[in-house]
Amino acid sequence: MKQITTWLAAGIFFLAILAGEQATAQKKRTTGSGFSAATRPRNLSDSALLDLVQKQTFRYFWDFAHPVSGLARERSNNSFSYGDEVVTTGGTGFGVMAVIVASERKWITRDSAARFLLKMVKFLSKADSYHGVFPHWLNGATGKTIPFSRKDDGADLVETSYLFQGLLCAAQYFDADNDTETSLRNRIGWLWNEIEWNWFTRDGREVLYWHWSPNNGWAMNHPIRGYNECLITYVLAAAAGDRYGVSPAVYHGGWAQSDNFKNGKDFYGIPLPLGFDYGGPLFFSHYSFLGLDPSGLKDRYADYWEQNRNQTLINREHCVRNPGHFKGYGPNCWGLTARDRKSTRLNSSH
């Protein structure tokens, strides 16, 4: 435990300083002062360490939110030269979840949380969207699309799924009979009801497509197939109802039809029902399950509790055995996923 405390404390220290410095520089709300080397907590219990990680995660989305829209920044503006205005729709969905947690744990008042999210939703109602689907990046001041790449300058169905995974949870959590929470629920409902999931089957094909743009059409040509972090996109598309929802055939004929969908092999003696050999990055077990409970969730392909548990156990065992002899890997330092490195933007950890 001592080793994991050291590794996590170092990560928390960096994130806390980042959140504190960015919040100060942007002159936005804060939930308290940032960390310093002199005052950072030491010798924390597991429970206290977990509390600290959770609170510092929330602070990124609260202290460093865009001052106009409230949406989440795309990583660090200073480190990655994105400029002051780039916000991310999918990351905002994660931030909505963090705000709900902060309200429940009394780090902020329920009313301030609801008002913060209402500002977000009002902004989104005027921002660019395409058949109800938002782009990956928006300008946080104007709501205009910022291209993610040359041809990716329109709708992003997967990022929109992450956004609404958070917003739908907010609509359930903020259930009070007052003007702020009623308006929040109604506005989330209006946005949700305008998402044309079935339009992204590209004229009725049995698969969902990730991107579409008015400038480039379907040029990205990226069908969403499993198994990866995109399960929630199909779940929400199926849940959308008769107007814009998709049929089970789209799930079975699209998502489940891939060379990397079924696995069935054992790794380190642990069976893996779905996905790439060794399971792939751990965010496959995270992103879709922020709002989707895997407990008891089964279909003809997998028990999703078993899938997530076993992928995680394989990930840990790989670090314990450390066949690549990477420095630091071991029983108290594991959890391989995507991460940032300043020199090359985004990398997958080994």
Where are these regions (language model features)?
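Bacterial Sec-dependent N-terminal signal peptides
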Residues: 1-33
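Ser/Thr/Asn(+Pro)-rich, low-complexity disordered segments
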Residues: 25-348
